[in-house]
Amino acid sequence: MEDHKLKIIHKALQGHKDAIDFVVHLSTIARAWDDIIDKDKGIDDDRINRAFWIALVEIPQNPFYQQHLFQITPLIRDYINSWLDANNMEQGASDHNKHVAFVLRDLIGNIVMQCAYLIGGYEWMRTVSPWVRSFQFEERLDKYMEGLTHGNI
């Protein structure tokens, strides 16, 4: 994960190590899964193995995840469903559907905001929400559309 994103996550999650680890691990899995499905970037066996290890060993053992399992699991389910929808909507779709896919594919940031809520409550979530959205949607729509055209999204 890029340093500037990690700094925002660290601040949004008030330095809560287990919450930060959870979000970083979830991001690692999401990036690997996306690269496997999109086939737009090479992904080596070590990265695939690491993603599966994180999913099956490290996240289930994470104390933050364990404590908030029933609040977090529906968010992960919704994020994965949105990401699957985005992948389908990108395929030969109208520009409108591609614009919708552009938003759906990055909803993992919503999980960060909910983790912030679990750590600091409503006021804290509302404080960090603009920062999180600033990196959640940092990619520009025109670059995304260009990437779809050239097959590198």
Question: Predicted regions span which residues?
Answer:
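All-alpha prenyltransferase/terpene-synthase fold signal
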Residues: M1-I153
